[in-house]
Amino acid sequence: SPCIIIDYLCVTETCFCERFKTNKELLEYITVMFTGVQNLLDTLNLGIVGVAQDYSDYNERVDTVAHETAHLIGAPHDEEGPCQDT
């Protein structure tokens, strides 16, 4: 079956990076965030393995990345999809 690969480039401002004492701490944070995104995508049963500005906490940030990833693969908002009148 065809496979879709989505690569991410995470760009942050200095004040975000200053929250972490080492690059290892930053990497661990990003890894946990994308694990959360993967967990949310798995609940959609889309078979997905796998640029939003976001100033929210961890849980909201995971939701935002998962939401924007769904748009990358063509998912519309609920009110914009083919089932909007049902």
Curated annotation (Swiss-Prot):
<protein>
    <recommendedName>
        <fullName>Venom metalloproteinase</fullName>
        <ecNumber>3.4.24.-</ecNumber>
    </recommendedName>
</protein>
<feature type="binding site">
    <location>
        <position position="77"/>
    </location>
    <ligand>
        <name>Zn(2+)</name>
    </ligand>
</feature>
<feature type="binding site">
    <location>
        <position position="67"/>
    </location>
    <ligand>
        <name>Zn(2+)</name>
    </ligand>
</feature>
<keyword id="KW-0645">Protease</keyword>
<dbReference type="GO" id="GO:0005576">
    <property type="term" value="C:extracellular region"/>
</dbReference>
<keyword id="KW-0479">Metal-binding</keyword>
<dbReference type="GO" id="GO:0046872">
    <property type="term" value="F:metal ion binding"/>
</dbReference>
<comment type="similarity">
    <text>Belongs to the venom metalloproteinase (M12B) family.</text>
</comment>
<feature type="binding site">
    <location>
        <position position="7"/>
    </location>
    <ligand>
        <name>Ca(2+)</name>
    </ligand>
</feature>
<keyword id="KW-0378">Hydrolase</keyword>
<keyword id="KW-0106">Calcium</keyword>
<dbReference type="GO" id="GO:0006508">
    <property type="term" value="P:proteolysis"/>
</dbReference>
<dbReference type="InterPro" id="IPR024079">
    <property type="entry name" value="MetalloPept_cat_dom_sf"/>
</dbReference>
<dbReference type="GO" id="GO:0008237">
    <property type="term" value="F:metallopeptidase activity"/>
</dbReference>
<dbReference type="GO" id="GO:0090729">
    <property type="term" value="F:toxin activity"/>
</dbReference>
<keyword id="KW-0964">Secreted</keyword>
<keyword id="KW-0862">Zinc</keyword>
<feature type="active site">
    <location>
        <position position="68"/>
    </location>
</feature>
<feature type="binding site">
    <location>
        <position position="71"/>
    </location>
    <ligand>
        <name>Zn(2+)</name>
    </ligand>
</feature>
<keyword id="KW-0800">Toxin</keyword>
<keyword id="KW-0482">Metalloprotease</keyword>
